[in-house]
């Protein structure tokens, strides 16, 4: 990782050094640096077209083109273009920033903290797993009633647990408890068979949620290690210096 950061630093130093030299090279004279002047800004003895008296071309008493008494273009008595006494700076108002749908989708995918559950988050919806319980009756019962079981799990961040088993155990307990309370409130009760099947289903979903959260946590940790290495910090500081300077 350190060698990679060093090579990146060497490449960027060489590239930005060339760009810095290009920016500092003097440029040849451009518009209004000694060449012809336009319009009507020649030497005192030079010819000017159109002849300039008290105002511009076609202006008897000064003002813009086609303005008898001064003012903006097409305005007989002053004012900005298309406005009786205002200015053209009032045409547009800054638009209000809109909330990015990508940001909203990203926040939803990361899991929303559930109020009143002590820091638990609700995971995204999953497809209920196909599970075999060892006999035809329970398999058929599960297929017919799987829609009554949770398709989302409650969980806490993985860094609050020492291993996967603790995460899954806590995830199963809180998910079944919340789902049972919600369903019972609606007047529906679960049998022992339902509870047995829910435990299996929720356990599989909690394992999937743990794997997903562990991978995301590892990726965040790897990014922090990369950007905290001394070569990368030096490289970023050098780039900021070149941009600001």
From Swiss-Prot:
Annotated residues for binding of Cu(2+) 4: 77-79
Glycan attachment sites: 173, 189
Residue ranges the record assigns to the propeptide: 223-245
Coiled-coil ranges per UniProt: none
Cysteines engaged in disulfide bonds, as pairs: 171-206
Lipidation, GPI-anchor amidated serine type: 222
Membrane topology listed for this record: Lipid-anchor; GPI-anchor
Localization (cell): Cell membrane; Golgi apparatus
GO molecular function: copper ion binding
Repeat (Sequence) residue spans along the chain: 51-59, 60-67, 68-75, 76-83
Associated disease: PrP is found in high quantity in the brain of humans and animals infected with the degenerative neurological diseases kuru, Creutzfeldt-Jakob disease (CJD), Gerstmann-Straussler syndrome (GSS), scrapie, bovine spongiform encephalopathy (BSE), transmissible mink encephalopathy (TME), etc.
UniProt name for this protein: Major prion protein
Origin species: Chlorocebus aethiops (Green monkey)
């Amino acid at each position: 990782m350190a060698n990679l950061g060093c090579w990146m630093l060497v490449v960027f130093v060489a590239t930005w050094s060339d760009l810095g030299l290009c920016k500092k090279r003097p440029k040849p004279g451009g518009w209004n640096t000694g060449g012809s002047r336009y319009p009507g800004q020649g030497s005192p003895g030079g010819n000017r077209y159109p002849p300039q008296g008290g105002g511009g071309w076609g202006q008897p008493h000064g003002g813009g083109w086609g303005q008898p008494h001064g003012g903006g273009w097409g305005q007989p008595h002053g004012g900005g273009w298309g406005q009786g006494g205002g200015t053209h700076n009032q045409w547009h108002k800054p638009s209000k920033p809109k909330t990015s749908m990508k940001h909203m989708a990203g926040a939803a995918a990361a899991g929303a903290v559930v109020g009143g559950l002590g820091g638990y988050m609700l995971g995204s919806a999953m497809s209920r797993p196909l599970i075999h319980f060892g006999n035809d009756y329970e398999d058929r019962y599960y297929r017919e009633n799987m829609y009554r079981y949770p398709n989302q799990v409650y969980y806490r961040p993985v860094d609050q647990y020492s291993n996967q088993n603790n995460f899954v155990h806590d995830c199963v307990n809180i998910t079944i408890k919340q789902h049972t309370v919600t369903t019972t409130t609606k007047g529906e009760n679960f049998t022992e068979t339902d509870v047995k099947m829910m435990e299996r289903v929720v356990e599989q979903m909690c394992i999937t949620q743990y794997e997903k959260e562990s991978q995301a946590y590892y990726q965040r940790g790897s990014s922090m290690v990369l950007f905290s290495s001394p070569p990368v910090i030096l490289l970023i500081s050098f780039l900021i210096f070149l941009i600001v300077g």
